[in-house]
């Protein structure tokens, strides 16, 4: 029998399911405690979240870069891929604001603009995968994902790390639509031959509208970052598109809700948060123009402490997003890929609100674990790498606080009901 919130061991039980947390804390609220579990359709009150970092402020460059971004997307033809009303909704949502809240004024203008462009593209791409016409057309979504994989493989087609990720992507495409994907896979392999032979440029490969825009961002990134470091961000993108396929496979098979452990693993990649942390390599490269700073070597980057730090930061942002997106994506749109829904189902919570409150407890634990991993990483590293490590952790903290401020203010989520202190939540958050 699954544990329930009546048990004092609930927090400990759920932690032990998917990580090694051992500290137990009391839930902050007992809202909706009664003999009957509330259905998912009932009112959800987002738990009050207070982060241990300063409140994020919107970068004054945001509106200018947002306008440039939508002009760029229009020039790539993406505005013609969605209904006019949907396009206007994307514009009104000010999707670049998440970058504006997460990146301070000291960021280089070219980095800020790149992040605005990629982020807005990502929101639209993700919507196409979840509820656009791609959601009903597996052939189209698989084709886009194979093209993205080709882009990521192009510069280093024999890289073992990338080949391993690529194999899992190709296997998933076959598992989802074996007959319909044959021609697409044949084209992918033919294009990979060209990549290995260097017989033509990546720009010469014919691609769809969305993937052409992604290629534009990718080529700008690899022009600036040494080849030995581009593999890092390429892997994060591969994990993201692989998770998109997993979600699509689950929808096709009408799979039941995953357990918490499996969901957390999938969510770590499906949120496409990792690239924002690894993008720091380009920020560091730009800093090197002005002052000496060493990149984090692969021995440290792929080491236990660095990976623990990045995984914890990724979990924090993804779980936080699940709380705020729950009314929109799960209650209204019926998407079960949400941690609130998963915890609600697996742990027999009395309400979705209580499931959200439990997740906040875990979220604060993950922040503490991120900070602990940072201290361990810094202690283990030579002093010459400390500045780069500090840039990485600052970026993690900034994206956590910036993402929170974006979710609090964005019309995309429009959460207005909170379980927490009786005072105005935004007022408390700004103190």
Curated annotation (Swiss-Prot):
Named cofactor requirement(s): Mg(2+)
Official protein name in the record: Alpha-gurjunene synthase
Sites where the protein binds (2E,6E)-farnesyl diphosphate: 267, 328, 412-413
One biological process term in Gene Ontology: terpenoid biosynthetic process
Residues that coordinate or bind Mg(2+) 2: 130
Residues where Mg(2+) 1 binds: 126, 130
Protein family (similarity comment): Belongs to the terpene synthase family.
Organism of origin: Marchantia polymorpha (Common liverwort)
SUPFAM superfamilies to which the protein is assigned, alphabetical: Terpenoid synthases
Cofactor: binding comment: Binds 3 Mg(2+) ions per subunit.
